[in-house]
Amino acid sequence: RLTALVDCDDIHCLMIGASGVGKTAYFLYPNIEYTCASGMSFFASDTKGDLARNYGTIARDCYGYQVSVVDLRNPTKSDGYNLLTLINHYMDVCRREPTNLAARAKAEKYAKILSKTIINPDGENFAQNQYFYDAAEGVLTAVTLLLAEYLPPKRIHGELRERRERRHIVSVFKLVQELLAPSILPGKNEFQLLMDRLPEEHKAKWFSGSALTAAEQSMASVMSTVLSRLNTFLDSELEQVLCFDSTIDAESFAAKKSSIFQILPEEDQTKNFLAGLMIQTLSRELFSVADEHDGKLPCRAMSLS
C-alpha cells in the first residue's frame, strides 16, 4: 500500500509546450488577468517583452497597479532597479532618527541579504576556501552600509534631485577598489585605515572583523574576491538600470498592488546573472517581509514566467 501526501493548492504550475502552442496567449495572459482582477502583486519575466507591452498598461490603467519594467534587452529604456534601494531608505531614516534601532536593523538585514546573494548566490560550500567567501560577505556588507550611511543623495542648489542618487552597486565597486590600495602605513591598506576611524561599536567594523584580523595576503585575497564578484556589474548599459532607484521595492511589492516585468534577452547570456540576482534578491527580501507578518505577505504575490 502506498500513501501519498498531495498538496492540491494552486501554488505551483509548470506548462511545457512547443513554440506556437499558446503558452503565453492562452495560459499566461488569462492568469495575469485573473491576478490583476484579484488584486495580487506579481512578477513576470519573458524574453520578448510581450507581457510588459500587452499587460503593463492594462495593469496600470485598468486595475490601478504600480508597474515597473526592468528591460535588460534595452537597458537605456528600462526603469531603474537599484539593488540598494531598501538599504538606502532605512539608512535615511536612521540619519533623521538616530535612535531608531529598528530602521538600522533593517538596513543591516537587507545589506546582508544582498551580500550573500552576490558572493554566494547558489549557497555552495567552498571547503577550504570557505573562509575567504564568508569574509568577503562581511566586507561587502560593511562597505554597503558605509556607503548608504555616509554618501547621501547629491543636492544641487540645496534641492534633493531624484535622479542624483549615488548609492548603488557600481559605487560599492569603486569604493572597494579605492580601499584596496596600499596606505601610507606599511602593512595596512586603505580599508583597514578606514575601519580604524570608525567607533568600536559600529556594525560595519564588526561585519568586516574576520578580514581585518587576517594576514596581509589573506586580506588581499578577501578584497579581490569581493572585486571579482562585483566585476559583473561593470557594464555601461546595465548601469542605466542599476544606478537609478527602483520604482518598486520588496516592501511596497508586498503591501500594494504591484507588478514587475522583467525582459531578459535569450540571445545575450551575459544578462542571465543579473536577472537571477534580481529574482533571488527580491525573493529573499519577500521572505524577510513575510517573517515580520507571521509568515504571510500582506498582499499575495505570484511569479509568472
Task: Describe the residue ranges of each PLM region.
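P-loop NTPase motor domains
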Residues: 4-305
